[in-house]
Structure formats: C-alpha cells, structure tokens
Amino acid sequence: MIKTYNGSKLGIASSHRKALLRNLAAALFLYEKITTTLSKAKELVSYSEKLVTKAKKADLSAMRAINGEINSKAAVKKIFDILVPRYKERSGGYTQILKVGTRRGDSADVAIVKLVT
C-alpha cells in the first residue's frame, strides 16, 4: 500500500530541509516578508504557522520550544514581543503566499511569503 507523506521533501536531505525551514522562518519573522520558490513557500507557511500557534501559549515551555527551533535570538524576541500580541485574537492564518511569477535563470515559480498584519 502506498503511503502519502505530510509535506514535501523539497529534493534535499532531512537535515538540510530542517535547517532550511528554520532559517526561512527566522528571516520571515525578522523581516515579515521574504521571496522564495513556491514549493519552499508552501512548506514555510505550514512550519511558521505551527511556531506562531505554539508561541501564543506564552509560557516557559513554549519559549524554550521556540528557542530550540529558531536559532536567531532577535527573531525569537520579535515573536514574543510583537507577533504574539498582534495575533492574540486570530486563530490561524498568520501568513500569506503571493505568487510573483517565474525566476529568469531557471524558470522556478517564485512567491512572496508575508505575515498578515
């Protein structure tokens, strides 16, 4: 029986994929808007939504969990100081994907991922 997997493998090793998502999430939380390929954007949205939902608990275990996931101290500080109060009343849908077009060099679909204000 063929088993379906949750999420895309992105054609890279699991450790590389995990590092990629952590770095993209840190950049998204710091700058609130980043440009990447469409497949990476879709994976990033699912990953970052889970992090924000976990951070909304705002207890010590949530802080430690987020700190373990994201290596940037500035991004973690921004999550708890700015983003959690912003999304306090919102139950999901913190990010948005906007398709931009294709990249000239390799014709990859490009998208902008941004945090909803």
UniProtKB/Swiss-Prot annotation:
PROSITE patterns: RIBOSOMAL_L17. One of its GO terms (molecular function) is structural constituent of ribosome. GO terms for cellular component: cytosolic large ribosomal subunit. Keywords: Ribonucleoprotein, Ribosomal protein. Disulfide bonds: none annotated. InterPro entries: Ribosomal_bL17 (IPR000456), Ribosomal_bL17_CS (IPR047859), Ribosomal_bL17_sf (IPR036373). It holds the Pfam family Ribosomal_L17. GO terms for biological process: translation. Belongs to the bacterial ribosomal protein bL17 family. NCBIfam families: L17. Part of the 50S ribosomal subunit. Contacts protein L32. This is Large ribosomal subunit protein bL17. It comes from Endomicrobium trichonymphae.
